[in-house]
Amino acid sequence: LSGDATDLTTIFSETFAATHNGGVTITDGAYNLSELKSVNAGTRGEITLSDRTVALSGDATDLALALAGTINHNGAVTVTDGAYNVSELAAIAGGTSGAITLNDKTVALSGDASDLKTIFDENITKHTGAVTVTDGSYNVSELLSIANGKTSGTITLDDNTVALSGDATDLTTIFSETFA
């Protein structure tokens, strides 16, 4: 299925007996967050953007829904609200390779180390809020992604008994951060 975002949004706003499973190509570069969200909700198939560089801006919930699934976006993304969570940011980070800007950098994040790694491995603005790692199965790679200059907030490990093994430089980087 291929067409401009407005036409595809109209198609997917209709009620179908079954969810569309085929690929969808958005052929124009004038799509917006609302249209991308509607198209993504209407298909389980891969979404291909002819213009992957369109900037998107909106609240984290809408951005996560627009960028969920298989999509090839690489434009800038701005999260405008201060109510985002780890799940939403992980979906956004998984859906774009573009720069992610947090308008409110102070929001506390709490979640699984692998989701936090997904977020902080992306090109994201420096986060200044507290970060809590909630699982007890984190590793050096995950902690390094969280601690490697992407956040200046205090990092809390809910389980601080996990044994860590790794390169001395990586461990030094991790432990140079502020832990609660």
What label would you give each PLM region?
Residues L1-A180:
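General marker for long, soluble alpha-helical cores
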